[in-house]
Amino acid sequence: SKHAHLKFYRKDGTTLSFVDVRRFGKWKAGETWSSNRGPDPTTEADEFKYNILKNLDKKVFDHPIHLVLMNQKYFNGIGNYLRAEILYRLPDIDPFMEARTVIEKNPKLIELCTVIPRKAYALGGGQLKDWENPFKTDKEKMEKFIQCYHNPAMAWCKDKNGRRFWFDPIWYDSYLRMIENNLIKK
């Protein structure tokens, strides 16, 4: 693949490649995760949950849940489409509410941070308009699974990193209040 930036070849003919189509990633050699990445929710679910709960008093959890879900120190591996899908599957959760409050009142959020990525990975992962999934996956199953992200019936805003955050339009007034109170930028 032209997007494989680093390749390791084995004697048996197999290859391990670092593929980064959109050039968001980086790779550092080492024996452990870097200090700014928490436990993987799909393979270290107990450690993942513990890491969040033991740090819930930190200032980072004062911010809206839709922003905190992108913090890899606590939500390792949760990216843009996964945060939209996780929050959408919690219809009573205002995605602009303080993360600490959301997590304390809705422990299912932490569970979904494990369940949703596992399901997405089992389906082979997503595909974007500018990136075709190289794994021969059932595109229709993944498209059915994605209910919120990039759905024209949903609302969206840009987060502090300039990424589109897709959310249920029932929360649009909450989004506008955040703008009025200068808590997020339009």
What are these regions (language model features)?
Residues 1-38, 103-104, 165, 171-176, ...:
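Acidic, proline/glycine-enriched N-terminal capping motif
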Residues 22-60:
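A short, charged helix-loop
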